[in-house]
Amino acid sequence: MGVVNYKNPLYWSETTLAHQTAKHSMDHRAQQEVEQVISGKDLEEVHGQAVRAYKQYSNLIHIASLFLNNINRPLKGIAVDMGSGTGVGACVLSKFDRISLIYAVEFSEQFVLQVMPITFEKFDADFEKIQPIVGDFNRLDLPDESVDIILDIDSFHHSEDLNFTFNECCRVLRPQGAIISVDRAWPDPYTRDHLNTMLNRELNENLKLKYGIPINDSFTRRDFGEHEYTIQEWVNSYQQKSFDVDVFSQWHPLVLNRIWLKLPITRLFTRLAFLRHKLGKRRHWMYGFNATRKLFVAVKNS
């Protein structure tokens, strides 16, 4: 499926940490989904996991942008969308006037070649700003301290070595550059045994078919390269690399919800977060309904 303004992808080198089973499964999924789009189905129906959540991701990135502006770290310059998948994150970033270039890095070649162009066209991305990359987010073929923003949307929890991944982020980010991460995190009281139980769950038949895995094969979330972390484990990983990290958790009132929706709640919550940040507080609230999806804003110290 040709999209006129879509740039040819660049191919970056890959580390041994790239999960090959997940990579081949993602390629299989991409080919299936593109065939369904060609047959007449809407991309939103075919790949609802990321595409249907476009507005939510856009809102979360805008919250991060407002917060960064408040702490004098505006969203601008060169960005990397890590584990870009459908390209939704790169699409959102392309609409920020002060973002000049986005590297959309995804290790599934078929997602880069076939799915990203459809996503960019559907959501009216600024094609000129986005350079698609077939590559591994553990090895970015970029100079040291050359990037201003790194974006993660549900990708870092696939890292086989979070310490290694954050080392690479730290290498390419300029001083005072920032990571915006929208990712899954569990309450701190969760034990490692509890998290391991989640990872040992078998993929259902529909997912096995989608990813080209034989239905009768035993295949768990762990086998697919998933990992689970508590909020504090994420925070510790950032702090070990000298990032100053703020965490936003989603919250909504149980009553009078319609009244809340009439208020400028995004600006109210980001302003409150800024005031708490000045007082040394690093955990904040934002309006939302997904209790396990957190927004991390991590600024690299000089």
Task: Please identify what each model-predicted range represents.
Residues T86-R139:
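Class I SAM-dependent methyltransferase SAM/SAH-binding core
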Residues N138-I149:
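A short acidic, Gly/Pro-enriched loop at the edge of an enzyme's catalytic core
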Residues I180-K208:
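Conserved class I S-adenosyl-L-methionine
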Residues M1-V46:
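N-terminal, positively charged/glycine-rich alpha-helical extensions of SAM-dependent methyltransferases
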Residues Q232-N236, V245-S302:
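A C-terminal cap/extension of S-adenosyl-L-methionine-dependent methyltransferases
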Residues K55-L75:
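Conserved alpha-helix/loop element of class I SAM-dependent methyltransferases that forms part
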Residues D217-E233:
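Acceptor-substrate binding/catalytic loop of class I
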Residues N163-P175:
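A short glycine-rich, Lys/Arg-flanked "PGG" loop and its adjoining helix->strand segment in the class I
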